[in-house]
Amino acid sequence: MIQPQSFLNVADNSGARKLMCIRVLGGGNQSANIGNIIIAVVKDAIPNTAFKKSDIVRAVIVRTKKGIKRENGMTIRFDDNAAVVINKEGNPRGTRVFGPIARELRDQNLTKILSLAPEVV
């Protein structure tokens, strides 16, 4: 569960390393889970890349420590909170995605991120 002021790792090679959530997009929810889009600020970035500290970006949540419950009763949890930086159209800014990605992103039509992922759980 991600809320404003939550810190997230970046799970792609866009150039940002750490994000801080400043807004959860979508009707009235103050917390985000896997597949939700957030507005975030870059807190740490790799030098000489597209992002620098204090840039405002859109990102989609791909992993949370809280996890999600599936219809078959299984709960999927991850070791960290992570997001992938996206553009206005919903396409990832990076060309690679690191770590496992939850299958629930397919429900939000984020199949481009799933196709870049090394492992879909």
UniProtKB/Swiss-Prot annotation:
SMART domains: Ribosomal_L14. The keyword Coiled coil does not apply. It is found in: Plastid, Chloroplast. SUPFAM superfamilies: Ribosomal protein L14. Belongs to the universal ribosomal protein uL14 family. Part of the 50S ribosomal subunit. This is Large ribosomal subunit protein uL14c. It comes from Oedogonium cardiacum (Filamentous green alga). The gene is rpl14.
